[in-house]
Regions:
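Start-transfer (signal-anchor) and selected internal transmembrane alpha helices
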Residues: 1-25, 110, 158
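Hydrophobic alpha-helical transmembrane segments
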Residues: 15-16, 68, 86, 114-118, ...
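Extracytoplasmic catalytic/substrate-binding loops of multi-pass membrane glycan-assembly enzymes
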Residues: 29-44, 55-72, 79-82
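Transmembrane alpha-helices of multi-pass, membrane-embedded glycan-processing enzymes
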Residues: 62, 66, 70-74, 78, ...
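Transmembrane-helix signature of polytopic, membrane-embedded enzymes
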Residues: 94, 99-122, 155-159
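Short acidic/glycine- and proline-prone juxtamembrane loop motifs at membrane-interface regions
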Residues: 127-138
């Protein structure tokens, strides 16, 4: 019971931040269809679940990473618009927690870390609300930079191993700058 109390007393801002980030992205994803919205990942993920594969069975204009990730999420939660938006919302929430953790590791007070990470979550994925190649590639690159910074501070060998893997995933999200 004491450990649970310590967890919630120290991490309540992180929990609030995660749910806020997921909510704001989910809200903006449901406002309607806009020119920035892309349905290609929806269709490609559906085709992957049907047994087709990018470049082998059909042509894609972006990297296959988002399509395979989205097909995994469709497999778990079902194929519908809310699940499609959930993919972007979860990435927004996870990235906001990473930014929050980075600011805390730099010694910034947790309230300021929360504020800056919340501002980041408002600007990050809600601009499109749906999975988008530029966002995934940028966020995976930001995650790579954060792991690089943490690796320099903590000197953990497994973190150095994650850097090239995340860079490959970022490349497979969007190959062209």
């Amino acid at each position: 019971m004491q450990n649970l109390k310590i967890f919630f007393s120290n991490n309540y801002l992180a929990i609030i931040l995660f749910f806020f980030s997921v909510f704001i992205c989910h809200f903006t994803g449901n406002r309607g269809v806009f020119p920035i919205d892309s349905f290609s990942h929806f269709d490609n993920a559906f085709r992957i679940l049907k047994g087709d594969h990018p470049f082998k069975d059909y042509w894609v204009v972006s990297g296959p990473f988002i399509d395979y990730l989205q097909s995994l999420i469709f497999l778990i939660f079902g194929i519908n618009w809310q699940t499609y938006i959930l993919s972007a919302s979860l990435l927004n929430g996870i990235l906001s927690l990473i930014i929050y953790s980075l600011f805390n590791n730099f010694g910034l007070h947790s309230r300021y870390s929360f504020f800056y990470a919340a501002c980041f979550s408002i600007l990050a994925y809600p601009s499109s609300g749906t999975p988008f190649v530029d966002h995934h590639s940028t966020f995976l690159s930001i995650l790579t930079l954060n792991i690089f910074i943490w690796s320099m501070i903590r000197d953990k060998a497994y973190q150095w191993f994650l850097i090239p893997i995340l860079m490959v995933f970022a490349f497979l999200s969007k190959q062209v700058p």
